[in-house]
Amino acid sequence: MGVPKQRWTPEEEAALKAGVAKHGPGKWRTILRDSDFSALLRLRSNVDLKDKWRNLSVTAGGYGSREKARMALKKGRRVVPKLTAEPMDVDEKDMDNAHDTVIDVEPLAMAFEPLPFLESPDKSVARLDDLIVEAIRKLNEPSGSNKAVISGYIEDQYWPPADFQYLLSTKLKSLVNSGKLIKVNQKYRIAPSSSLGGISTKVSSSEGMNTENNNVKRLTKPQVVAELEKMKGMTREEAAAFAAKAVAEAEVAMAEAEEAARVAEAAENDAEAAKAFLDAVILSMRNRNAASMILRAC
């Protein structure tokens, strides 16, 4: 059993409201790291802050989430994925009186209804594609981002549905199988020639990838050594251009390796299926021959 949650104190609520006023809703980890609020909120997690802020906003609005959603549909208002607020300066006096004030913002029941996940299945899939790509690009980790990090980013910035983890796992697998994402050591990166994010080219086969990247020069080890010698006399701009070129070549090589691995795995599966079929045919023929010999003996 986990440690029971402590009731929120007025000081903690004041710190939460001031943190939202300073950094904006959804920036729970930033608020927890802020030295102005970390001491008061040291016993709280980002999930605690998110849940408490939702409850405060629903109470301030005077309606529950279902009533607000129904009103929004009647008015034809579009549900926005994220609530933003203008940053403001906060001093100690404001901190003391913050728990007695209510921030004039739209209740989270409307602002954080599950994105366009509720619009239709087709739109939810397309929207989740965009969120995954946004997370990977904003995180910008050199070796890629794992599922937990991607999930944490989306949950911090948006309000996902209850089955979000299942949807995320399914969509990540689909994007990897389609060649739009590259998965290495449980981490995901955007494929160099993927169609995600407005790039028109798409990785569909090793032949197509070779055609699209045939203008990239492949260097042997002696050529690499020679290029490194040349870099000693390069200007800063020339060195940056050379480094960008080397990164592009490395990404292409990794994408080709991933594609080759997928092709090899598919070939192995086909070979196993063919062998199983052959074994079944041989067994059937043996049984038939044995039956024929028994009939002849009789």
UniProtKB/Swiss-Prot annotation:
Location in the cell: Nucleus; Chromosome; Nucleus, Nucleolus; Chromosome, Telomere
HTH myb-type domain location is 1-61
Show the coiled coil region(s): 237-278
GO cellular component term of the entry, any: nucleus
Q: Which GO terms describe its biological process?
A: nucleosome assembly
Q: Which residues bind DNA?
A: 28-57
According to the UniProt entry, its GO molecular function terms are: double-stranded telomeric DNA binding; protein homodimerization activity; single-stranded telomeric DNA binding
Where does it mainly reside?
nucleus
Q: Extract the Gene3D superfamilies matched here.
A: 1.10.246.220, Winged helix-like DNA-binding domain superfamily/Winged helix DNA-binding domain
Keywords per UniProt: Chromosome, Coiled coil, DNA-binding, Nucleus, Telomere, Transcription, Transcription regulation
Q: InterPro entries attached here?
A: Histone_H1/H5_H15, Homeodomain-like_sf, Myb_dom, SANT/Myb, SMH1-6, WH-like_DNA-bd_sf, WH_DNA-bd_sf
According to the entry, every stretch annotated as the H15 domain falls at: 124-192
Recorded domain comment = HTH myb-type domain confers double-stranded telomeric DNA-binding while the H15 domain is involved in non-specific DNA-protein interaction and multimerization.
Self-association and partners: Forms a homodimer and heterodimers.
* Purpose: Binds preferentially double-stranded telomeric repeats, but may also bind to the single telomeric strand.
User: PANTHER family from the xrefs?
Assistant: SINGLE MYB HISTONE 1, SINGLE MYB HISTONE 4
The UniProt entry's sequence similarity note says: Belongs to the histone H1/H5 family. SMH subfamily.
Protein name (database record): Single myb histone 2
Q: Which organism is it from?
A: Zea mays
The root-end lineage is:
Eukaryota, Viridiplantae, Streptophyta, Embryophyta, Tracheophyta
Its gene is SMH2
